[in-house]
Regions:
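A charged N-terminal "starter" segment
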Residues: 1-111, 116-132
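Aromatic, loop-rich ligand-recognition surfaces of beta-strand-rich domains
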Residues: 135
Length: 135
């Protein structure tokens, strides 16, 4: 792996013929700090924006410990690379199996719902849990 100080350095030294992924941990840190200082609410990172493990791991190190997750694989990713972080299962449609895995296996307590049917599924999958945060 090569290290470049700026993306422009990469292009100048090694013009890419195919797409190139660039990891910029400093940019993640800068953005995390900016949002915490300038946003008055709780900062949640939407895993779907960039599910790279290095991003998920860098966020708690920079103060962001809440994640918007939309699937069990995203939940598992956060559990692995940002253990102890708060997760909100925000996908509008989720199976009872996914809800149960989120709740029982990974401690997710916040679930988004948009219909009565989704509420019924959340309650059924969690055994009518009393510690839910439903939004």
């Amino acid at each position: 792996m090569h290290t470049y100080h700026k993306p422009l350095d990469l292009v100048r030294q090694r013009p890419p013929e195919r797409p190139v992924a660039i990891a910029r941990p400093d940019a993640v840190a800068t953005a995390a700090h900016w949002f915490q200082e300038n946003f008055k609410g709780d900062v949640f990172y939407a895993v779907k924006a960039n599910p790279s493990p290095w991003v998920i791991e860098a966020l708690p190190a920079n103060g962001v410990t809440s994640f918007d997750v939309a699937s069990v694989p995203e939940i598992e990713l956060v559990a692995q690379f940002a253990p102890g972080s708060r997760m909100a299962f925000m996908h509008p449609v989720k199976s009872r199996a996914a809800i149960a895995a989120a709740y029982f296996d990974h401690g997710v307590r916040t679930f988004a719902l948009v219909t009565h049917e989704v509420l019924v599924n959340i309650l059924a999958a969690t055994g009518d849990a009393k510690d839910l945060n439903l939004i």
